[in-house]
Amino acid sequence: MNSITIDNDIIINTCSNFDNEQKKISLNTNINFIQFHFCLEGKVILNYNDRAYQFQLSENSSIILFNPSTNLPIDGELEKNSKYLSLLITIKKFHGLFSELTGNISFLSNENVDKKYYKENVISPQISTVLNQIINEKLSDNVKNLYLKGKIFELLGMYFNESNDLNIEQCPFLADEKNVVKIKKAKEI
């Protein structure tokens, strides 16, 4: 597992497994961190509390985990042909970034601040692009942390963006070119 500490509040962990067998992953955390886990390819299994809880993430899925009363160190497995990224960010840093949006992010609201939070999501093509940019960065050490911090902020902004007004014509990841043609024709009418 490749771990990069951006500062005391942000840690990125990446792991790829293109071997022919499962790869163990282990992350020590502390109670102050919100965990974001992203499976870009293959499958990852995340075990918590001596395997009492287990989350399986398939390709292009993610999960947010936060438990204000219990530390959540990770004991997991990365299946073969898999790519995984975790982002650990302190609740203090996260709350500082989103303080104006606490009403829009359910686990930051006053009534939920002391509650466990677990939520699975699908990774959008835009988020997948940012995740791959983080994983594949090849910058010199003097600008690496600045670049990665910017990408983390971009990732979080996209992750919590509630807008559904994406311009489908400009989406470079649109799987079906026929849909783009149909949309263009409909706009012309």
Feature locations, PLM:
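N-terminal regulatory/effector-sensing and dimerization cores
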Residues: 2-105
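A short mid-domain helix/strand-loop element embedded in enzyme catalytic domains
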Residues: 94-97, 101-131
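Extended serine/threonine-enriched, polar tracts that run as long, contiguous segments within proteins
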Residues: 134-137, 155
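Short, Lys/Arg-enriched, Trp-marked, Pro/Gly-tolerant hinge/linker segments that flank
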Residues: 109-122, 138-147, 158-188
